[in-house]
């Protein structure tokens, strides 16, 4: 047992040799002692090793082709958006690693600035789902925020720093990991200012929020309230550097296509000019021709657009794509509902024309892929109510008439077993 002096009254740390008077705390074990300073040192060593293990290694990071292939398994269509996201994420971590190498070598190197992403496209076409699916693949902190809840500092609503808090929480409050994470800001079109011209009055949920987002998009040392909510002077803040945080902002931008058409339509003037009808533009990807001036006219400020150099657009989903979404992805809706019915011992089947009818309804409602689940819930509600209470059903078949004419699905009765037939005859 570690003791000091002839009397052996003072105990000492078995690792550093300091006496109990030289340290704040001495913890005893079976025949050994350890002081608080040695415990702190051990914790630091463990944290450093864990941090090194969590760092994204370039050779371990999926290549753009691999990222796109993973997205293909869950998201139908939107090939351009998949490629853009895959390249942006890969380059984001290459840039971070290049910065770390230049700091280690202490030599003058080319500074690589980040390229945040703006995603445009109609509602229900997969913008949010693409980001959520991407999060499954990457071992990095990932947070999704809603721009509609944000207001300028000092007004009722959420500060922009609360977006960073979600990222810190996703990293289990490991600020170092959070500083290399990804933030997806949805509904960014809702913070467009109310008119193209700068307003004299304050626009606290529009232009004011855009101004507040500028610094964290570009890269700054932000102070984040650890419990969220508004800042007040009598609280400690979490400091986070957003220089290496990749931002993906997205919105439906309803009405932007008209602005694009007005600009593109002006090309059809004079002899030999190519004249395209509005229908021709609308049937293709009208967001593919977006220019910064279109976004400014929509209501985004030039400084905000300048911090989003990469623009990716998603297109309206046609009938064929919606049918594929229903049945082909790994977690397709048909597979999900089939599994639900299997748990009750019943087989579920959709005919091909039933899937087409569901896709037609989604197009008619204008809800895109997001509306498919609601339609299927309506179609299956009667049988999902009855089936759990019945033991005579083997199969449920959903047809085109079930979807279009509110006809009940076809019920295929279960054949009684030999013992049941014997009991019945007895």
UniProtKB/Swiss-Prot annotation:
Annotated positions binding Zn(2+): 13, 16, 35, 38
InterPro entries: AAA+_ATPase, ATP-dep_Clp_protease_ClpX, ATPase_AAA_core, Clp_ATPase_C, Clp_protease_ATP-bd_su_ClpX, ClpX_bact, P-loop_NTPase, Znf_CppX_C4
Any one GO molecular function term: ATP hydrolysis activity
PROSITE patterns according to UniProt: CLPX_ZB
Lineage: superkingdom: Bacteria
Residues engaged in binding ATP: 122-129
Pfam family, one: ClpB_D2-small
Keyword Metal-binding: yes
Keywords in alphabetical order: ATP-binding, Chaperone, Metal-binding, Nucleotide-binding, Zinc
SUPFAM superfamilies for this protein: Glucocorticoid receptor-like (DNA-binding domain), P-loop containing nucleoside triphosphate hydrolases
GO BP annotation list: cell division; proteolysis involved in protein catabolic process
Residue span, ClpX-type ZB domain: 1-54
Gene3D superfamilies hit by this protein: 1.10.8.60, ClpX chaperone, C4-type zinc finger domain, P-loop containing nucleotide triphosphate hydrolases
Subunit structure and binding partners: Component of the ClpX-ClpP complex. Forms a hexameric ring that, in the presence of ATP, binds to fourteen ClpP subunits assembled into a disk-like structure with a central cavity, resembling the structure of eukaryotic proteasomes.
Family: Belongs to the ClpX chaperone family.
Name of the molecule in the record: ATP-dependent Clp protease ATP-binding subunit ClpX
Species this chain originates from: Mycobacterium marinum (strain ATCC BAA-535 / M)
The encoding gene: clpX
């Amino acid at each position: 047992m570690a003791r000091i002096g002839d009397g052996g009254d003072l105990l000492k740390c078995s690792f550093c040799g300091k006496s109990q008077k030289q340290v704040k705390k001495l913890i005893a074990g079976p025949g050994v002692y350890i002081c608080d300073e040695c415990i702190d040192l051990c914790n630091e060593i463990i944290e450093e090793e864990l941090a090194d293990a969590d760092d994204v290694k370039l050779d371990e990071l999926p290549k753009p082709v691999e990222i796109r292939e993973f997205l293909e398994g869950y998201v139908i269509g939107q090939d351009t958006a998949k490629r853009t996201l895959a390249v942006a994420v890969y380059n984001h971590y290459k840039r971070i690693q290049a910065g770390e190498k230049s700091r280690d070598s202490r030599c003058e190197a080319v500074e690589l600035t980040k390229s945040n992403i703006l995603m445009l496209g109609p509602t229900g076409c997969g913008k949010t789902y693409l980001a959520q699916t991407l999060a499954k693949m990457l071992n990095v902190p990932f947070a999704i925020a809603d721009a509609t809840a944000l207001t300028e500092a000092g007004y009722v609503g959420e500060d922009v720093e609360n977006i960073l808090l979600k990222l810190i929480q996703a990293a289990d409050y490991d600020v170092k990991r959070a500083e290399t994470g990804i933030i997806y800001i949805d509904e960014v079109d809702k913070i467009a200012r109310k008119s193209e011209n700068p307003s004299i009055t304050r626009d606290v949920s529009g232009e004011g929020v855009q101004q507040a987002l500028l610094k964290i998009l570009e890269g700054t040392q932000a102070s984040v309230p650890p419990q969220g909510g508004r800042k007040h002077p009598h609280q400690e803040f979490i400091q986070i550097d957003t220089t290496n945080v990749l931002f993906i902002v997205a919105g439906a931008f309803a009405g932007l296509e008209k602005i694009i058409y007005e600009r593109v339509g002006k090309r059809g003037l004079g002899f030999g000019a190519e004249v395209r009808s509005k229908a021709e533009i609308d049937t293709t990807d009208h967001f593919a021709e977006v220019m910064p001036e279109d976004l400014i006219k929509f209501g985004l400020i030039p400084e905000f657009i300048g911090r989003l150099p990469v623009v990716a657009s998603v297109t309206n989903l046609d009938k064929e794509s919606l049918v594929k979404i229903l049945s082909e992805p790994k977690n397709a809706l048909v597979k999900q509902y089939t599994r639900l019915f299997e748990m009750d011992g019943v087989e579920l089947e959709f005919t091909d024309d039933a899937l087409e009818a569901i896709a037609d309804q989604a197009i008619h409602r204008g809800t895109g892929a997001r509306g498919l689940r609601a339609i299927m819930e309506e179609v299956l509600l009667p049988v999902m109510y009855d089936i759990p209470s019945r033991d005579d059903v083997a199969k449920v078949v959903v047809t085109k008439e079930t979807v279009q004419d509110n006809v009940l699905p076809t019920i295929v009765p279960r054949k009684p077993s030999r013992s049941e037939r014997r009991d019945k005859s007895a």
